[in-house]
Regions:
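Extended alpha-helical targeting/anchoring segments
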Residues: 2-171
């Protein structure tokens, strides 16, 4: 599931601008307990099927595994339509970063993630965009959730552990 930035209004007494786009029908937070989860281990090119229901576990796992092994999935092309738009200009985003640095230096916060929304119209299957993202940014924190009426996908760009030569670093 997920928690959006807008949830801060329910947990703290902080005034914020509504960052929800008018056509965004995603709730502020949503968590689901799934009976079955397919975990993709991208670096090893493996999948793991996790079952949380022990009563009919074996029969259902075999049915799901057969569907996965079928390899007869329809895929659709993905094409961008028109130009990319953003909620902020480059200068507005730079000013937000400058303000964030000031807050860090004053000790108001210890970390800030300065996000900027970009929008791009498209035709086709957004799962193909996720697959492309997975190939150009093979982050261990990739996610794709299809909730039916909306989908959320992305990856975390930061490095938490890196290896350079014979040295391992934790960031």
């Amino acid at each position: 599931g997920f928690t959006s930035f807008n949830v801060i209004r329910y947990t703290d007494d902080i005034e914020i601008k509504d960052s929800t786009a008018s056509r965004n029908d995603a709730p502020d937070l949503l968590y689901i307990l799934y009976r079955y989860i397919i975990v993709f281990k991208g670096f090893r090119h493996e999948m793991e099927l996790v079952a949380l229901d022990r009563d009919n576990e074996h029969a259902d796992i075999e049915r799901i595994a057969n569907r996965i092994n079928n390899n007869n999935f329809r895929t659709y092309d993905f094409h961008a339509v028109g130009g990319t738009t953003s909620t902020l200009t480059d200068e507005q985003h730079r000013e937000n970063i400058r303000q964030g640095i000031k807050h860090c230096r004053r000790g108001d916060v210890f970390q800030i993630v300065m996000s900027r929304r970009f929008e791009q119209r498209y035709t086709g299957d957004d799962f193909n965009l996720y697959r492309a993202l997975r190939s150009v940014n093979p982050s261990p924190y990739l996610f794709y959730f299809d909730f039916g009426s909306f989908r959320i996908f992305g990856s975390s760009p930061e490095t938490h552990c890196r290896i350079e030569g014979n040295n391992a670093y934790i960031d």
